[in-house]
């Protein structure tokens, strides 16, 4: 279903997510409650396990198809010389990942994680955030839709990463805006 408004499809998707499996969550919490250990001695891991059980519908929860998705893009703000690295370094890093020689490749091999690297049109940088929004609504929605390809083929744990010259500047600007 496609709408005339850029984010309507995402709003619809979020509004129609399946409900959490509260029975699976309850079973996991019960397992922790009857375990021979001091109360809440595992800290947040108990809450994380219960959350994963609720959203996966499996108690106890299990991660069998983890995936690391790395999104590579170039930012218009780099024209101000904000990084000592040239913009071409992003494409070089993507090529290194594709060849299996990047650090993320080795981490994924060591921990049996799937890896997908997405080139977000490296030849078309976003707008310069010192002058305008990096993406307009349509561009943002299109990029989000492209990003949803990360889960094509299925995954039960999605880890996200970014790659690109200028990313830390844009992240700092977002942080400053939000907080």
Which residue ranges define each predicted feature?
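N-terminal loops that bind phosphate or other acidic moieties
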Residues: 1-179
């Amino acid at each position: 279903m496609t709408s005339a408004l850029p984010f309507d499809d995402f709003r619809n998707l979020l509004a129609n997510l399946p409900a959490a499996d509260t029975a699976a969550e309850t079973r996991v919490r019960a397992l922790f409650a009857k375990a021979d250990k001091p109360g809440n001695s595992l800290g947040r891991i108990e809450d994380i396990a219960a959350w994963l059980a609720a959203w996966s519908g499996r108690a106890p929860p299990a991660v069998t198809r983890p995936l690391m998705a790395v999104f590579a893009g170039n930012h218009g703000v780099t024209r101000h010389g904000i990084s000592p690295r040239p913009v071409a370094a992003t494409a070089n890093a993507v090529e290194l990942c594709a060849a299996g020689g990047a650090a993320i490749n080795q981490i994924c091999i060591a921990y049996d994680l799937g890896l997908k690297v997405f080139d977000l049109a490296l030849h078309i940088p976003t707008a310069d955030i010192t002058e305008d929004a990096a993406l307009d609504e349509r561009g943002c929605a299109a990029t989000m839709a492209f990003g949803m390809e990360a889960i094509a083929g299925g995954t039960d744990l999605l880890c996200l990463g970014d790659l690109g010259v200028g990313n830390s500047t844009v992240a700092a600007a977002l942080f400053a805006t939000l907080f």
